[in-house]
């Protein structure tokens, strides 16, 4: 089956919003109207009548899918769910990566809230073209122009107003369309599906004229000929205006602003028109960049069906009916059922079923094309952030470097019944989120979960309770410290046990040399002349590595050093693999004591985005946390502070930052490197651990 919709008719968009700005209602209404104007596939053959919609309305459709497809004006719109939480920069960045454009929803009463600032800045970083929808204009206290001012002042954007509300709060009944220069009035009884075009009411004419002139002036900046014609007194017609607005939106010179009330079913159709008219298709986006399998050579794929197949898996979801679903955005080529290559893991995967998620049904696909967003069933190896591609033309679209977790907490199930459920739940969550790890503590037998920050673990524990119904007690968060050797050292260690019968004997001579951060433990076998038989050497390495894992000073792993096994001795009868493993353990313990141990702590790269008024407070607070300021910068009209701060000093930071900036600043942090702990702090830690 050939492609139904050409690529320029695709819109891959996300709806970004603060938690209460009405993201779900807006998405739900979009699906309601698009479902109405388009019978979905052959599933109903015209049975998609109003009654089916009313049940949907009673139930209040909640879109659980990570990507939903709908149709409007001969265009195909894929709506990708963007997470509301910002602490997971990984999540947000990944969803922005697969979007081509975005709609930012704002609450008509509250305007631009801190959370909306955050998501906006992320989208700015990734150069995602976007437009704004000021929602909830039917609420008491709603004020459209105040929201427009906030978009200008708080986000530093240039708002281009396309619609004005007619009536406000409980009298809100329609919109003035500035491009077409007419009024749109919704008819109450049709659930917002019917509206009529009228002349602009007398009392709105002056305001509409002023707003329209301002809009045209901003739009004609995009084209010299249009600008000249306008200055000579010729206004551009509606089609020309739309082209100019599209050009400016894609170039991110301004953001179109629309308004309405999704809950009261007003303003959603103009929003859909604007998505089609102004947001980019996959063809408007530069080719997707990647690297070849060597990890070095740059490579790219154009958005075309003729290019080799490439796609990015951006979300893994568990579905009650088909099990695990892998959502992937296809950037190039086409995908049929069969084998694809997971280039990040270098493993082959079989595509058994491909599904397209509609608002209320799923459609099995035989083929999918560039620009599509599909759910794949039955992927065994693929995790979030992996690239899928044609085996004969491999490419890695994104090296998702998932940072090592830096914070850990112990979790204990409350009852015996929770024990098994907890194991399952944690494994499921770890599959969905690669920056989350589960381990069990060697000595205490406790389950330890590790993640990127306090909020990250809080939310995962919360999901465990809500989605998997597991009740658990959670310990206090711990920093994942590490130990390292203070200087090179040579050790000659003999393990000997003779007590009648066969004994144990093994002698090893090793040089240990500290190496640079991130090098790990490297083992070099430099035995000459068979002083230790080949088969015993892995045992020496095993013993040393395992002992390094349990640490020496306060029980954290010793990292980043080289082991050179230079000499040793064995006994024909008494030597065994076990004897050499014990000798390796002893040598490691002795080496750690002789060399001395330095304590290392994780240092985080922290980025704080704050309004200028609080800049001094933010920097002062950073310094008090042993932070080193790397620099400050201006983004839009906010100040960005970058600093390196030890993780141990970042606990509870979010609450403190909120309190002295009144909730207007936000921060993100990522692991940067391990660094030596100052002596006074290390002494405190030792006495605490003891």
Swiss-Prot record:
A Gene Ontology term for the protein's cellular component: cytoplasm
Location of the protein in the cell: Cytoplasm
Gene3D superfamilies given in the database record: 3.30.230.10, 3.30.70.240, Elongation Factor G (Translational Gtpase), domain 3 (3.30.70.870), P-loop containing nucleotide triphosphate hydrolases (3.40.50.300), Translation factors (2.40.30.10)
Keywords, ordered alphabetically: Cytoplasm, Elongation factor, GTP-binding, Nucleotide-binding, Protein biosynthesis
Highest taxon of the lineage: Bacteria
InterPro entries noted in UniProt: EF-G-like_DII, EFG_II, EFG_III, EFG_III/V, EFG_IV, EFG_V, EFG_V-like, G_TR_CS
One of the Pfam families matching this protein, by short name: GTP_EFTU
One MF term in the entry's GO annotations: GTP binding
Coiled-coil ranges (or none): none
Residues the entry annotates as binding GTP: 17-24, 81-85, 135-138
Keyword Transmembrane included in the entry's annotation: no
GO biological processes: ribosome disassembly
Annotated tr-type G domain residues: 8-283
Protein task: Catalyzes the GTP-dependent ribosomal translocation step during translation elongation. During this step, the ribosome changes from the pre-translocational (PRE) to the post-translocational (POST) state as the newly formed A-site-bound peptidyl-tRNA and P-site-bound deacylated tRNA move to the P and E sites, respectively. Catalyzes the coordinated movement of the two tRNA molecules, the mRNA and conformational changes in the ribosome.
NCBIfam families with a match to the protein in the record: EF-G (TIGR00484), PRK12740.1-3 (NF009379), PRK12740.1-5 (NF009381), small_GTP (TIGR00231)
PANTHER family documented for this protein: RIBOSOME-RELEASING FACTOR 2, MITOCHONDRIAL, TRANSLATION ELONGATION FACTOR G-RELATED
Family (UniProt): Belongs to the TRAFAC class translation factor GTPase superfamily. Classic translation factor GTPase family. EF-G/EF-2 subfamily.
Protein name, UniProt field: Elongation factor G
